[in-house]
Every structure is written in structure tokens, then in C-alpha cells.
Amino acid sequence: MAAKLIVGLGNPGPKYSWTRHNAGFMVLDRLASLSGIQVTRKAFSGLSGDGNWSSERVYLLKPQTFMNLSGRSVAEALRFYKLSLSDLIVIHDDLDIPFGKVKLKEGGGHGGHNGLRSLAQELGSSAYARIRVGIGRPVHGDVVNFVLTNFAKEEMDSLLEVLDTSVDALEMMIKEGMPKAMSIFNAR
């Protein structure tokens, strides 16, 4: 049985729990809840857990290093589990996608996302699968402040649906492959 390292990007601590930048953590928490995998073990400068889900051995990781150092945590976990970049799936927020949309991508640049920038620096490559959770862009104001604010009330009302869509996309990536998952979820 193959294995996957599934990483949700975010910032640690209750202060950031419901911020837009923590969409990756939120999706990973939803996956953990649905799969019964506990993500509570302290390892790899993060919180981790493992189990079987969707006919795969999966290792779940929430780096606790703050976003701009997440690459260290991910690199450490990949080395420990002897996995390659093709076994890595990273879930993160994306300003360039409207709130409520979920898009899949293989490879590509960091687009100004500090977590992805850290991954590229530590891994020496961006050749891994991504689930991009749309958070939209601020109409006015600073992007940094925007990603560190909580979702608005009207967004919170539909957040669970977004998290479930992200988990569905992840499951299709694992079961049926990235091309099929991209053709379905990127068309929505």
C-alpha cells in the first residue's frame, strides 16, 4: 500500500484558529474528524497523526512553526517516512481564488504565499500536489492583514461546505488520480 503525506498549512495557536490563512489547518482538521485520525502527536515541529483513509496509508501534518517556516516541518516528515514529493499533498489558502472555491494544482510557484515559499526553499522543488482553498482578495486594505483576519460571518455559514469539498477533492486525488480530480474540481 502506498502512503501519502497530507499537510495543512496554517499558523499555530488559538489566535489564528479561524483566520483565512489557516484554511489548510481547517481542511486537515475536517479530514481528521471524518477519518477518525487524531492529529495530536508532537513530531516534525508540528502535530501529526497517521492511519488508513481512502484505501491509503496517510500521514497528516500541521506544522507548528508559523507559516513562513513550514517547509522545515514538511521536509523533516518526508525524510522520516522516506516519501518523495510525488507522495506529498499540501492544502493551503489562496488569495487568487474566490471564497468558496477549491482548486487543485500540481507544481507551480509560491504566488507570494510564505508557506509555499518556505516549502520551495526547504524541498528544493515545488513539484507536489496542492489543494488551494479560495479565500478571495480584500477589496481595500493590506493583504497581510486580510489573511490574518477571521472569516466573515457570512463566510463562516458556508465554511463547512468548503471544507467538505476540499476533503472530497483530496479523496478523489488519492482514489482516481490528479488528472481526473483536476478535471472535476477545477471546472466548478
Curated annotation (Swiss-Prot):
Keywords: Cytoplasm, Hydrolase, RNA-binding, tRNA-binding. NCBIfam families: pth. GO terms for cellular component: cytoplasm. Disulfide bonds: none annotated. One of its GO terms (molecular function) is tRNA binding. The record marks N11 as: Discriminates between blocked and unblocked aminoacyl-tRNA. The keyword Zinc does not apply. It is found in: Cytoplasm. SUPFAM superfamilies: Peptidyl-tRNA hydrolase-like. This is Peptidyl-tRNA hydrolase. TRNA binds at Y16, F66, N68, N114. The active site is at H21 (proton acceptor). Monomer. Hydrolyzes ribosome-free peptidyl-tRNAs (with 1 or more amino acids incorporated), which drop off the ribosome during protein synthesis, or as a result of ribosome stalling. Pfam families: Pept_tRNA_hydro.
